[in-house]
Amino acid sequence: MKREPSKLGIKREKLKEKSKIKEPLSITPHNHIMPRLSFRSWLEENAATAKECWVEVKRGRPTDDQHLWYIDAVEEALCFGWIDSQAILIDGKQILRFSPRRRNSPWTELNKERVRRLERLGLMTDAGRRVLPPMGKRSFHIDKDLETALKQARVWTKFKSFPPLYQRIRAYNVTFYKKRNPRTYQQALSHLIEATKSLRMYGDWNDYGRLDG
C-alpha cells in the first residue's frame, strides 16, 4: 500500500548500521486474541505517535489465526494511515517494517482497492482517510505509451477483456517503472504482452479473491 519493500536477506548488522533501526517490535497475541487483532490494537494505541513498528509476518494465502499474515497486516496498516516498507529475514522469519505514510506519497491501485473494501467493512479510521489520494476508480487512466504498446502488439482488445481491477493494477505496476527504471519497464511490458496474448492473468492481483474484480 506503494515505498517498494527492500529485498529480503539483508544482513541484520548492515541494516541496523545503515538506518539505526531498533530491535524488531514483537507483537504477540494475548488472551487468545488473534495476531491480526493484536496488531490492530497496537495501532489503535500507538499509530498517532509511533514512528515505526517491526512485526513478523507470513506470506501467502491466510489459512489460520496463528500467524499475522502479510495481507492482514497491510490492511490494518492502511486503516490507520500506515504503510509497509523494508523487510528483513531473522532466523528464517520475515520481519516487516510499518510506519506512517507520508502525505502525497504514491498509491498503488491495489492499495486503493484494499481501502475501498476496508471502508465497506467499516474498518477505516479518520487517520487512514486523511492520507488517501483521489479514490474514484475513474481517476485512473492507462498511460498512453502503454496503451500504444499493447495496441501495436495486438493485445489491447484482450487486455480490455480482463477484470477492470486487474487492468488497473497491471497498468499501474508496469508504468511505475517507466521513468524509474526503463530496463525493468521493458521487461514488465514484455511480460504483460506475452501473458495477455494467451489471455493469462498473472500475479495475486485480488488478494486471493478478497477484492472485487
Q: Residues of each region from the PLM?
A:
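Charge-dense, helix-prone N-terminal extensions
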Residues: 2-213
